[in-house]
């Protein structure tokens, strides 16, 4: 991800770290996570204990980072120590500190060995995609699931063909390119007692029709 200053946030999932790379000469400005971590963890180690992560992004004026922390290579139900999570961090580049703002765990306590995504929504909710665990979950900001969708068998791993690599939620307005369809029932062969049905399949913002004769 490119920053406003022209630098780059680079996620190295096999090294379990994030690096901010200078966009001019390519040197690392700082490293977050793994053995070369340069930040003081204010959350008892939970802020820097991520691995195999995906979809790392700056958030809120680049003082926050969100990501999907796979936290291991196992896929399926898991123990507390290896649960995948949606992770929201706050960083202070002056004090070189990092803390956990929020963690989002799957309601069924699962792990995703690969893939995954994290999207911060305008409402404050969070959409998480669970990669090799074929599911996606929307949470409120405080961590309450409000939508939990499972697209396949949990624990199928790489044999599962219903991965959820990324899931994005957005407002969508359907406006078909074709004209509405009309059906008229006129038992008296005139407008008396006649009924008119209108359908515009795909339109999302039609509340009522005004028929002008």
Stretches found by the model and what they are:
Residues 1-213:
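Histidine-/acidic-rich catalytic cores in large beta-rich domains
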């Amino acid at each position: 991800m490119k920053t406003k200053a022209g630098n780059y946030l680079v996620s190295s999932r096999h090294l379990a770290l994030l690096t901010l790379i200078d966009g001019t000469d390519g040197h690392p400005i700082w490293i977050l996570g793994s053995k070369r971590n340069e930040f003081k963890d204010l959350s008892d180690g939970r802020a820097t204990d991520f691995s195999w992560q995906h979809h790392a992004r700056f958030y809120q004026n680049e003082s926050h980072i969100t990501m999907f922390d796979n936290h291991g290579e196992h896929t399926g139900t898991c123990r507390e120590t290896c649960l995948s999570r949606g992770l929201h961090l706050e960083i202070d580049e002056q004090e070189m500190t990092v803390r956990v703002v929020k963690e989002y765990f799957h309601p069924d306590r699962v792990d995703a060995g690969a893939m995954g995504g994290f999207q911060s929504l305008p409402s404050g909710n969070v959409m998480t995609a669970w990669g090799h665990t074929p599911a996606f979950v929307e949470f409120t900001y405080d961590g309450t699931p409000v939508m939990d969708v499972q697209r396949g068998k949990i624990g199928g791993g790489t044999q599962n063909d219903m991965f959820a690599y990324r899931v994005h939620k957005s407002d969508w307005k359907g406006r078909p390119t074709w004209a509405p369809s009309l059906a008229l029932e006129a038992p008296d062969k005139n407008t008396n007692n006649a009924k008119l049905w209108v359908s515009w399949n795909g339109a999302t913002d039609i509340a009522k029709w005004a028929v002008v004769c």
